[in-house]
Amino acid sequence: MKIIVIGATGRVGANVVAKLAQNSNDEIYAGARKPEKIPAADNVTPFKLDLNDKMDDIKEGLPEADAIIFTAGSGGRDLLKVDLHGAVKVMQAAEEKEINRFVMLSSKGSLSPDEFADSSLENYLIAKYYADQWLIHNTDLDYTILQPTALVEKTGSGKVTLGAYSTNENSIDNVADVLIGLVENHAGIKEVIEMSTGNEPIPEAINELN
């Protein structure tokens, strides 16, 4: 499978690329503003992608692929231009290039606007809300939106809860495994999926989505 990872030098994106690189059957295109930071691997092709560019330029830079995993974010620095508008431009480019599978890394509560004011991440959630809404209502992509709880840098347990929240955190390791599993198993299409650390092995949890 040919998979594009957007945000390939971020915490989650880098983890996704590293895991995919271990599967010789996958051809990975790792997109980032600074592709030189992406570790070399036989089946990983880094490419430059700046979400501040025009949509046509983003489209021209996108390789031919079967799926996109979108993990990019501005870290709160440029929410409208990157987390919202940048994401929408990638969706538009994907449609024009007929890359129909699109897995979006979002956040818990991104589609619950009545709760935004109570969150310390209010502005981030607003940006994610409109990006997610665009993906659902303004594209024909085979999307999946993953809504994990807080991301933590610890070794993944390999066990999760999908479709509900059982804890307040997720290891980045587990999130990367779920994103990959959603793509490789064609699971959760046209679904918004809640995620937290849990008790079910990731392959089993993903299989139950089909």
Where are the regions that the model predicts?
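NAD(P)H-binding glycine-rich loop region in Rossmannoid oxidoreductase-like domains
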Residues: 33-89, 93-96, 183-187
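SDR active-site lid
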Residues: 117-118, 122, 126, 150-173
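Glycine/proline-rich active-site loop of Rossmann-fold NAD(P)-dependent oxidoreductases
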Residues: 154-160, 182-191
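Substrate-positioning beta->alpha
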Residues: 86, 167-181, 191
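Non-catalytic, hydrophobic alpha-helical segments
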Residues: 12, 68, 146, 175-179, ...
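N-terminal Rossmann NAD(P)H-binding glycine-rich loop of SDR-like oxidoreductase domains
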Residues: 3-23
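Conserved Rossmann-fold NAD(P)-dependent oxidoreductase catalytic core, especially the SDR/UDP-sugar
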Residues: 29, 34-35, 76, 82-133, ...
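Short-chain dehydrogenase/reductase
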Residues: 192-200
